[in-house]
Amino acid sequence: MLASRMSFERSRDHEAYLSRLKQVPRYIDQTLEMLRNGMELGFLPPAVTLEGVIDQISSQVGSDPQQTLFYSPFGSMPSTIDEQDQTRLQNLAKTVIGDQVQPAFRKFKEFMQTEYIPLARDTFACLYYPTGSDYYGHCSRRHTTTHMNAMEIHKIGQSEVARIRKQMQQVISEVEFEGDFAAFIEHLRTDSSFYHDDPEELLRGYRDICKRADAMLPHLFGRLPRAPYGVRKIPDFEAPRSTTAYYRPAPPDGSQPGWFYANTHDLKSRPRYEMEALALHEAVPGHHLQLALQNELENLPRWRTTTHFTAYTEGWGLYSESLGEAMGFYQDPYSRFGQLSYEMWRALRLVVDTGIHHLGWSRQQAIDVMLENSALSIKNIESEVDRYISWPGQALAYKIGELVIQELVQDARSKLGQRFDIRSFHDHLLEEGSMPLDLLRSRMESWIDSNL
């Protein structure tokens, strides 16, 4: 992934890349030191979250340096570099990868096989860490930037699940489906018409959605980012264990565009009806728009433009999904159900994450709750639950952040009436970058008061 985020037009670009590769052994040594410190303190991950790790490491190692992903920038080099220099750089790359990178990854693989994985625990909750619930409380506060406790969040999640479930049921009635909620979900999961057969067709679909979204942005925003973005597939080595999609922001110097990465592995778990909501979240008006604007802010110090609070960033991404109807999306009931399914997914996170780490739910119990209430594929649900197990509290940030933004929008509409301008509201919300939710609330309330 490092190579995909760099430009390789000149010799010095390749040399800069090699200088980074030379630091891989140090990086892995530091990682091993941190993992061993965690082991000494009793912080070990559940075994289920380490499944597939050895295969992932092995895919990085290989035997021939030229067959590794690290060598990809040297396989086909640009004509702007003369042949003699190309040969020099290729030989240097083979040496660096063979003598430094591959041995470091083999060392990491041996550590995981012989020291780490054998000691992995068979429990899932934070309750079984040395500091127990105190640790989960810290994780929750850190990711949500609020002081809500686990049961408050759990109850908010239950309330949101009930609200969204009612809206989903209305869509089921609209399409005149004969059967209950579970039967409709099974229909969505098994009817081949809801899925693509060709990975390129899936990517083209996302690109089309993004083009349509681009055209609608001026109706909702006064300021738009200069940085472009594109759609790519998640690399093959990563895709089987990866999520449905993610966004990689452009580098601060603007030398590369931002990238919306879509998973083309196992197309039968990538339904068409979720594509609009997903693209709006990851690209525009979601992560690309927000993060690119933040990167381009000129009135802030650099550390502010590169700081990210999950509740703000992911709250904005989820809020962006709700803008789809105003942008001309979700026009058919199945796409609307897909948007509701994605909102339900984030609401379920409040229930499931707290259920696992505060109430001590089993992995299967968490999976069952998600299966019963969402249209996500079984593969996606299992991947998601394993993520919640291994990353306590992070998944809470999405819905909590979105709820705060929605509350601020409703407050502004109510108080400002005819003076409310959604473009000005969005511009002000985004103009100082990512921040804790309490600070965001204070800023937006001041903006509302100043416009009364």
Language-model-derived ranges and their functions:
Residues M1-L452:
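N-terminal maturation segment of proteins
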